Amino acid sequence: GIHLGRPDTGSPITVARGTGSHLNAAGTPWGLRLLNGLARAPGAAGAAIRSLFTPGLEKILTGAEPPILTTEMAAGGGVCTANGLATLYTPLACDGMIAGRRYLSGAAMQAIRRIERYRPDGGLFFYLPPLWHLGYHTFPTRGGWSAFGHIGLGGSFGLADPRSGLSIGFVHNRLALESIGWDMATPAWLLPLILSGLRASGRISREQAPDIAA
């Protein structure tokens, strides 16, 4: 299942309670001083802080019912299972098709696969060129250069790799200021392992990919 925000009452999908310290430290006097100092820093670190943090951000992420779940912010308040997220990306990996049914036209797939922007990103991507597609970015990691998708707050992500016909969903419920850098970098070490392992097995075809996507 996949929901844009809190699932409706009666839905079989429920919100997993978040773990970690969330971003509570960002709202303390010490945390505010630290973030304000980092925001003024030159280079990639300062750019990332300015792009992500604003005073009061931590308030919408805390509690048993985080207010962010009342927004329609997919990269921050999406609620889904790994299988649901992988299924969402399956048409992007399989020429617009799922189980023989077309969801995206050939023209739409060509447009989505086309890279629209090659310039380095001066914000969250630490001046690396994320190579933006239509709403998706590449994952510039070993073995994943043909893949694209989107990463969300905390490090959950969805990905499609048209070359192998593989879609991947990775979700978790940890959000902690002390580990957010590592968690957001998860694709950098996880994707090479997944893609290299599946391709090396020699047992994965485009027809099989949707079944093992999650």
Residue spans for each PLM region:
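Catalytic loop of the DD-peptidase/beta-lactamase superfamily, centered on the K-T-G motif
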Residues: G1-A214
